[in-house]
From Swiss-Prot:
SUPFAM superfamilies listed in its UniProt record: TPR-like
Range annotated as the organelle transit peptide: 1-45
Protein name per the record: PsbD mRNA maturation factor Nac2, chloroplastic
Self-association and partners: Part of 2 complexes of about 600 and less than 2000 kDa, both of which also contain non-polysomal RNA.
Keywords: Chloroplast, mRNA processing, Plastid, Repeat, TPR repeat, Transit peptide
Keyword Transcription belongs to the record: no
Species the sequence originates in: Chlamydomonas reinhardtii
Spans through the membrane: none
Alphabetized SMART domains for the sequence: HAT
Length: 1385
């Protein structure tokens, strides 16, 4: 749909009229496109003569001639004046009433939107959509009227201008769509506005991805409406959420033909006099000229001292007396369109909202961020570099990683650089730039002319610029200039860079201008670019800003491979390195208890954990010990850099999470304060900036302050320093046998070290068999080759397995961080082993649907290699080429930068295994971030996520989410994995498991059928599919699937256990017992399947009354695994049913200590034991808790977010009825001595007080159990008498048939003996069944040389599986598990 015409009689004057048409700028986008929205009352605008105040804006247009008149009293942008139009005005309804403030802000918002439209580059797709023929005609006239040969200014269409005038009011819901009816607005304009509101509503939708929403808008809305809504959304800047900003940015990119923003292109084509106007307007606010485009992080352009209170001594004086929005230039920065070339800087805390002098702001921590157009030159800013350079200590300007120079007056651009924490970005071959400290140099490639680049559609590329001031006292080091360069910079004619003019060095000039803003003591600058890998022109400009100047190709490769890992994992992200420093009387200590006087630096990858108990919080890296915290108060905090992925550029912020343990909802003791604001357990992450203060606990005994660092800490260097590998290297050089024995490790010889270096697989196996010797070898190897990522990964996996809680797990996290750091730095990646390549081929379906003869070898660059799994089945022993045995660090010379592979399979494996480690430590948020980072790295493979090994990472992630009950998280992970790995069988099985848990059986069956089509023998599939069919009611098909599974996998005890459960649920107890016995003969005592088989079999036998066999199974299992919660719960149940209540209570307490208080089975069993003891108050309290936990699990299974389910759980436990139960239970616990009088102290039960004393001796459940036992005894006695009578009859018949005499007597005795053990002659009832295994070897039984294994089943057990006659007993569930009556509540 094209632009719709507007009636020619309509003319709109927008300004401060005598009656005041009022609207207001809204800071969030909430779409109001429905008629049911609340309507606001309006006051109409009289067509009288308008009156303008200072700074007011007038926008008028005449529809007949399509002329636009835009004037701004205080501003730097002026459109060509037009003759004032004549004609009628828009007659607004008189029922509308707005305030004066709303009117002013609406006028300003509309003028900015019209300015954004007029700045669209002539001929661009956006200009064609929003201006059209009218805009082209007026632009032509404007071009002839204006001076110099500048680009014509496009003019909005009349209907677009009318819609722009009304869109702010509709967005802010001052007007509803229904208010447009009545004839006062043209129907075409009203339709355009409706579609624009639909686009706004799509931007706030969180049920679909951003790309899907953008596609929907492109398909269902007209292009002019989408373009108008996108420009309006981009104008909102920091007022919108990050997801909405990403939506509007992508929509603009789609509408603009995939190129850069037309507004930036228009800014690039402006004339020098227009830049002079902008510069004069900027200097009025005391700012240095620079372009700011990245609106998502425009908030960092504000002063961090004024954004938060109580951050430093300088900011404490002002407190909250001033705010960012109170500054005029700050408010302008927030309200400006992101595509406009704005000028932004932070206000000084002492400015108090007043205009300051031109120059840098002394109180700004973060100065600006922005997108630097490739063809815009800020030549006037280059001259400010030398003028504003400080002279600290009598020397020249000093910047950490920043060097800018230039001379004004000659118009020649000068070179300046921003160095990223001592590292440099990748550059194209043949580039050169001015040398920066920490980087090399190389000749600069001759760039293409500006016209050619514009024709190629590359007007600008996104980049982000971050300037920070980490320390107010330390002086930065002096910059390093290249040889032969003068201290005051290059010559003004640009001789230092031949062939480059001012137009080609625009990004350098912008960086020099930005560096001048930080002129002052301690003013280093960090630059991080957000560029695509195939964007050559943008990377060329970004590499100059990153200080990646290189002198030759060899040094270029070495510099690119030795970059600091602290920022390489955050390439494309803006972040500020920080550390945590103690400001209280209690010092911060490391995991070993040693004080940290310099604080604890926050690494850019992974979390750090601070707590006061390393046993409760494994992996604690910072100990808090004040010796005054009450017992039971477990304080812990997690700090981690989090990337906001909802925004295209990925904002990065250091966030704090309160992960303390709460006991009985005592949240006050676990509260934390960030700048005086409380952060409770379970709250979302709180973003932190330098200067923030953190206090712990109710007494605030621990206090810390965040300080910025000049560069991010390196995980590799920190690990080498903490592990003292340099000392091992020096000692090994002096002594051939090394000094491993000094640290308690065995001595290793040089031959062992050489053998381990040549065979990495044997070293990985040794890490499992002999961890001390493997650690000694790893120390020796890493002392010689600290950059070998495979060695670090083997050590990290070994530490995660063998190290205990506390310092051990913190050491494992440090090793994983070093492995990831080393993997990023490796110049040459070895090819993955053949096993990993074959696994990747199976994941991509190459072995089933592609040509069978495809090569399975990988090239040396690692692009064809893939990681198969991220769990224990794929460890770092695959880091060495099995054919050559060469180490990654032993490669012959680094390759050229262009030869470095995009996909790093070692990094995928390091991040994936690190995520596993964090998940085991219950750091679920950190584990999710690491899984996501591993999947993103795997997706860089040329074959996609599946070929890069990401499918295994996503499968492990989804499986852990499903085990935790997070069905919605698991569904999201499985859906994404299936989209990217459509031929992975394991992912289809995972999706079926998720839908089975959510009770979507038909969908689960569909996933099972897809997986079966890919692989007909998958073991995991046969664990899920029969359960799905049984849930759908097809029992025969479920049994058939189990039989097929056992035919394909006869030794799989998981399948056997699942089959036995199915038979037990169907009532086939004999078949279930046979299957349980078969599984235990294969795997009797393993901690996984063996324990579950025993627990399930013992539970079934207990329900059937065969307590002897159940006790035998449980005692054997508990002897091997005394802390198994599953066995302890069944054992408690058995003791309870037999009347031994104290033993049952002790067993269930042990189970609760292992499984926790949120295990429904454990807590339900404890409630049953307490009810059997007669403790009604305690039982009712636990029953309430169990019902709340079950409701929590049901909500998670139904697809609710975990936060929603927990919120409902908390609300359910805070009702008056529940509080009454809790109070009664606590009073009785105090009476029994099970709870201390003072919370936090250890309970001291009085002597002689036992649970159940003085109460009913037997609960109703016990009485029912005794009645059941009596009926079973009577039944056995009746069967015994019947068997004896039958035996006598058979004996008499045998004697009569033999004809009497001795032969008859012998036959009668034989018949009697046979009948006594026959089908009706046994003492216990029915005839036993033959459960002898014909071929034990077939089922994997290790017979050895001795007799067959002892049988688990006996003949007398058969009576519990078959009941030929009914004894009129109630169901077992009704007998064993009575519901609580009115007395229990």
């Amino acid at each position: 749909m094209g632009a719709l015409p507007c009636p020619a009689h309509i003319e709109h004057h927008q300004g401060l009229s005598s009656f005041g048409t009022r609207r207001v700028l809204r800071q969030s986008v909430a779409c109001g496109a429905h008629r049911s929205r609340r309507r606001s009352l309006w006051a109409g605008a009289s067509p009288g003569a308008p009156k303008y105040d200072e700074g007011a804006l007038s926008c008028s247009f005449q529809l007949g001639s399509a002329s636009l008149h835009v004037s701004e009293v205080r501003g730097s942008r002026h459109a060509t004046p037009r003759a004032p139009p004549t004609g009628g005005c828009i007659e607004l309804p008189k029922t509308l009433a707005l305030t004066e403030e709303q009117d002013q802000r609406a006028a300003r918002a509309t003028s900015q939107l019209l300015n954004a439209i007029s700045r669209c580059a002539a001929g661009s797709p956006l200009a064609r959509l929003l201006t059209g023929p009218h805009g082209a005609a007026s632009a032509t006239g404007a071009g002839s009227h204006s001076s110099s040969a500048g680009a014509p200014t496009p003019t909005p269409r009349p209907d677009i201008a009318a819609a722009a005038a009304l869109l702010p009011s509709l967005t802010w819901r001052w007007v509803s769509v229904a208010d447009l009816e009545g004839g006062w607005v043209d129907r075409g304009v009203a339709h355009l506005l409706r579609e624009a509101l639909l686009v706004q509503k799509a931007a706030s939708d969180v049920n679909a991805s951003v790309s899907e929403l953008v596609g929907w808008c492109m398909d269902n809305c007209s292009a002019p409406a989408a373009a108008l809504a996108a420009l309006w959304g981009q104008q909102q800047g920091a007022a919108l959420p990050a997801r909405s900003r990403s939506f509007y940015g992508l929509l603009l990119q789609r509408l603009d033909g995939g190129g850069a923003s037309s507004a930036v292109a228009a800014a690039a084509g402006r004339q020098p006099h227009e830049h002079q106007q902008e510069r004069s307007s900027a200097e009025a606010y005391g700012l240095s000229p620079a372009l700011v485009f990245c609106s998502s992080v425009a908030r960092t352009a504000l002063s961090t001292s004024s954004r938060r209170g109580g951050r430093s001594s300088s900011s404490e004086e002002d407190g909250d007396a001033h705010d960012d929005r109170s500054h005029p230039h700050t408010q302008q920065l927030l309200e400006q369109d992101g595509s406009e070339p704005l000028v932004g800087a932070a206000a000084s805390p002492s400015s108090n909202g007043k205009r300051s002098a031109a120059g840098p702001s002394a109180g700004a921590d973060v100065i600006l961020v922005g997108e630097l157009p490739g063809d815009v030159l800020l030549d006037e800013s280059v001259g400010n570099v030398r003028r504003q350079q400080p002279h600290a200590n009598g020397s020249g300007a000093k910047h950490n990683g920043v060097n800018g120079s230039g001379k004004s007056g000659s118009g020649g651009a000068k070179v300046a650089h921003a160095h990223v924490n001592g590292s440099a970005a990748d550059t194209d071959p043949g580039q050169a730039a001015l040398g920066v400290k920490g980087s090399a140099e190389s000749p600069l490639e001759q760039p293409a002319p500006a016209a050619k680049r514009s024709a190629a559609g590359k007007a600008s590329r996104p980049a982000a610029l971050l300037l920070k001031r980490p320390s107010r006292s330390a002086a930065p080091p002096a910059p390093t200039l290249p040889d032969g360069a003068e201290a005051d910079g290059f010559a003004s004619d640009g001789s230092g860079l031949p062939g480059h003019g001012q137009q080609q060095l625009s990004a350098i000039a912008a960086a020099a201008a930005a560096s001048s803003l930080l002129a002052g003591p301690a003013a280093p600058m960090s630059f991080l670019e957000t560029l695509s890998d195939d964007d050559d022109e943008a990377r060329r400009a970004a590499s100059l800003l990153n200080g990646a100047g290189m002198s030759d190709p060899a040094s270029a490769s070495s510099t690119s491979t030795s970059s600091n890992s602290g920022t390489s994992n955050l390439v494309g992200r803006v972040f500020v390195p920080m550390r945590l420093v103690s400001v209280s009387r209690f010092p911060l200590r490391d995991a070993l208890g040693r004080p940290l006087p310099d604080g604890l630096a926050v690494p850019p990858t992974g979390p750090i954990v601070l707590s006061n108990d390393a046993r409760v919080f494994p992996g604690t890296e910072g100990l808090l010990s004040d010796y005054a915290t009450p017992a039971g108060d477990k304080l812990a905090v997690r700090l981690e850099y989090i990337t906001d992925r909802s925004y295209a550029y990925g904002d990065v912020a250091l966030q704090l999470f309160n992960i303390s343990r709460v006991t009985r909802k005592r949240t006050d003791n676990c509260q934390m304060l960030v700048n005086g604001k409380p952060v409770n357990v379970g709250d979302p992450g709180v973003p932190l900036v330098p200067g923030d203060e953190i206090r712990f606990g109710a007494s605030a005994a621990f206090a810390f302050r965040l300080e910025a660092l000049p560069e991010a800490p390196s995980g590799l260097e920190a690990a080498v320093q903490q592990l003292q590998l340099h000392a091992d290297s020096s000692s090994s050089n002096g002594n051939g046998s090394g000094s491993s024995s000094s640290s308690g490790l065995p001595q290793v010889s040089e031959e062992e070290v050489a053998a381990a270096a040549a065979d990495m697989a044997s070293l990985s196996n040794m890490s499992r068999r002999d961890p001390p010797r493997a650690e000694a070898l790893l120390r020796r190897l890493l002392a010689a080759r600290p950059g070998d990522a495979a060695l670090w990964l083997i050590w990290a996996q070994m530490a995660a397995r063998v190290e205990g809680p506390g310092p051990g797990q913190a050491k494992a996290r440090m090793l994983f961080r070093a492995a990831a750091d080393a993997a990023r730095r490796m110049p040459v990646l070895p090819p993955p082993p053949l096993a990993l390549q074959m696994a990747a081929r199976r994941a991509t379906g190459a072995g089933r649907r592609r040509r069978r003869g495809a090569s399975t070898t990988a090239s040396m660059d690692g692009d064809d290699g893939a990681l198969s799994v991220a769990d224990g089945s794929s460890s770092a022993d695959a880091a060495i080429d099995p054919a050559s045995g060469a180490s990654p660090s032993a490669a012959a010379g680094p390759p050229a930068p262009s030869a470095r592979p995009r996909h790093n399979w070692l990094l995928v494996q390091a991040l994936g295994n690190w995520g596993k480690h964090e998940w085991r430590l219950r750091m679920y948020g950190s584990a999710r971030h690491l899984f996501r980072a591993a999947a993103d790295e795997a997706a860089r493979h040329s074959g996609g996520l599946a070929a890069g090994g990401g499918g295994a990472v996503m499968h492990y992630w989804g499986s852990r989410e499903l085990e935790a009950g997070n069905v919605r998280n698991a569904r999201i992970v499985a859906a994404e994995a299936l989209r990217k790995c459509p031929a992975d069988v394991a992912l289809y099985v995972l999706a079926a498991s998720v839908e089975l848990e959510a009770s979507n059986l038909e969908l689960a069956k569909g996933y099972c059928q897809r997986a079966y089509a890919l692989d007909r023998t998958d073991k995991q599939l046969f664990l899920i599919w029969p359960r799905v069919e049984a849930g759908l009611g097809d029992r025969d098909k479920a049994r058939l699937l189990f039989e097929r599974a056992l035919d394909a996998h006869p030794l799989n005890t998981k399948i056997i256990n699942m089959y036995a459960r199915f038979e037990a649920e169907e009532g086939s107890y004999r078949e279930a017992a046979e299957l349980y016995d078969r599984a235990l003969q294969i795997d009797p005592l393993s901690p996984g399947p063996g324990v579950h088989n025993r627990a399930d079999w013992a539970s079934m036998e207990t329900d059937l009354g065969n307590t002897g066999l159940a006790r035998q199974l449980l005692e054997e299992g508990l002897e091997a695994h005394p802390n198994s919660a599953a066995l302890l719960v069944v054992y408690s149940k058995l003791q309870r049913l037999e009347g031994r209540y104290q033993e049952a209570l002790a067993a269930v307490r042990r189970a609760q200590a292992v499984a926790g208080a949120f295990n429904a089975a454990v807590m339900n069993e404890r409630a049953q034991v307490l009810r059997a003891l007669g403790e009604r108050e305690l039982a009712a309290n636990l029953s309430r808790h169990v019902s709340a936990v079950k409701q929590l699990n049901r909500m998670k299974q139904q697809g609710y977010w975990g936060s929603e389910a927990w919120r409902a759980f908390v609300e359910a436990t805070r009702t008056p009825e529940q509080r009454t139960l809790v109070a009664a239970a606590r009073a009785h616990r105090l009476q029994l001595g099970w709870a201390p009088a003072v919370r936090g102290a250890k309970p001291g039960p009085p002597p002689g007080v036992v649970a159940g004393d003085g109460r009913r001796p037997a609960a109703p459940e016990t009485q029912q159990w005794m009645a059941l036992e009596e009926l079973r005894r009577q039944r056995a006695e009746a069967r015994r008498l019947t068997a004896q009578r039958t035996a006598r009859l058979r004996a008499e018949e045998a004697a009569a048939a033999a004809g009497g005499g001795e032969a008859g007597a012998a036959a009668a005795a034989a018949a009697l003996a046979m009948g006594s053990t026959g089908s009706m002659g046994s003492m216990d009832g029915d005839e036993g069944y033959d459960d002898e295994i014909q071929d034990p070897v077939m089922y994997g039984a290790d017979l050895g040389s001795g007799p067959l294994p002892r049988r688990r089943l006996e003949d007398q057990d058969a009576d519990y599986y078959e009941e030929p006659e009914s004894m009129a007993l109630p169901p077992l569930d009704a007998v064993r598990r009575p519901m609580p009556d009115a007395d229990d509540m």
